[in-house]
């Protein structure tokens, strides 16, 4: 459980770092206004630009697919995996339908989440083997 939780934190940090590096606007943003706000490091209303303003990669897709992949490898239970996969799919669709992310931003987030989920599971597995 500790490895899973630390993986969630690591996954979130990776997402924040990528958002700050890529600085891709969300689809509902006016590209011109977004560029001006970034240039002046200011939102309309004088609050600073935060990582949450950026859309690439989708943090929700990344986190949900991280959990799904980790749980798949940890439990190897098809019913639980299907439940998590269904919830993850609904979350990804919701992010697109509500215009919070483009399809590409969601796909990239999902891929990164899958990769980190497998990496964290493998790391946890090696730690358990070393304890024996």
Q: What are the roles of these predicted feature ranges?
A:
Residues 34-132:
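Membrane-embedded catalytic cores of phosphoryl/pyrophosphoryl-handling enzymes
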């Amino acid at each position: 459980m500790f490895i899973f939780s630390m993986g969630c934190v690591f996954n979130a940090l990776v997402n924040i770092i990528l958002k700050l590096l890529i600085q891709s606007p969300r689809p509902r943003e006016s590209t011109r206004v977004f560029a001006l706000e970034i240039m002046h490091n200011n939102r309309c209303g004088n609050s600073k630009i935060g990582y949450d303003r950026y859309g690439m990669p989708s943090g929700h897709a990344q986190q949900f697919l991280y959990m799904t992949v980790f749980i798949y490898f940890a439990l190897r239970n098809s019913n639980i995996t299907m439940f998590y996969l269904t919830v993850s799919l609904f979350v990804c669709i919701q992010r697109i339908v509500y215009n919070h992310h483009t399809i590409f931003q969601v796909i990239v987030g999902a891929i990164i989440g899958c990769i980190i989920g497998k990496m964290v599971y493998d790391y946890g597995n090696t730690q358990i083997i070393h304890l024996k």
